[in-house]
A protein has these predicted regions:
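ABC ATPase "signature
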Residues: 165-166
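Conserved ABC transporter NBD signature motif
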Residues: 14-27
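Catalytic Walker B motif of ABC-type/P-loop ATPase nucleotide-binding domains
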Residues: 105-109, 114
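Helix-to-loop junction immediately C-terminal to a conserved catalytic motif
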Residues: 6
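Helix N-cap at the start of a conserved alpha-helix in ABC-type nucleotide-binding domains
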Residues: 116-118
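Conserved H-loop
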Residues: 134-143
Length: 201
């Protein structure tokens, strides 16, 4: 869905619009920024040069803020993008997303490869950014528990179908996390909509 919104994939059917404009139009694409798992910059480009490039394509890109984030995350600006670890590759893309200042910022699995400290820092910066520069931020993640307190509205999608679409507070009030012996848990869950299961041992 996020790739369709940002024009990277074409829908099989139907239409997608951003503020009334077709999603693949310049008017729509200029309002959107996708922080995905893939790096879209040349691999041998240095982080510093990538920030310069972002500023060209996104007029409201805050270069000084991006550099301050790089300092907080300890991301070296003179390092080539292909020399970054998985975690620091994610951090590089997160910094772009937090600094771009478009009306809509889409984060697809944003904390991939990040350790707990860097995940916490990202979530803190996400809230801070929203407070200072309100915009629509979409976070697509499997780590629901980590973002539940940050998200106002939740859409749960499985295999292309919307299972739930409601305010987060309303959804969490109607959900349970159940643990115990497998047989007892399976018995309790029978007939209920199970979102995910984890087996230990």
């Amino acid at each position: 869905l996020l790739n369709i919104l940002t024009g990277r994939l074409c829908p099989d059917s139907g239409t997608v619009a951003v503020d009334g404009a077709p999603a693949d139009s310049d008017a729509a694409l200029g309002k959107l920024f996708l922080v995905g798992e893939k790096n879209l910059y040349p691999d041998d480009m240095k982080v510093k040069r990538a920030l310069d490039t972002a500023a060209v394509f996104y007029p409201d890109f805050d270069r000084s803020y991006a550099e301050s984030l790089a300092k907080q995350f300890e991301l070296p600006l003179n390092k080539k993008i292909n020399g970054l670890s998985t975690g620091y590759g994610s951090i590089f893309r997160l910094i772009l997303g937090l600094s771009v200042n478009t009306p809509y910022v889409l984060f697809d699995e944003p904390v991939l490869g990040l350790d707990a400290q860097h995940r916490d820092l990202f979530y803190k910066l996400l809230v801070q950014k929203y407070a200072e520069h309100p915009c629509t931020m979409v976070v697509s993640t499997h780590l629901i528990a980590e973002v539940a307190d940050l998200i106002e509205h939740t859409v749960i999608i499985r295999k292309g179908r919307i299972l739930q679409d409601a305010p987060t507070e309303e959804l969490t009030a109607a959900c349970w996390a159940v643990s115990g012996p497998a047989g007892l848990v399976d018995g309790w869950a029978a007939g209920r909509n199970v979102l995910t299961t984890t087996a230990l041992g």
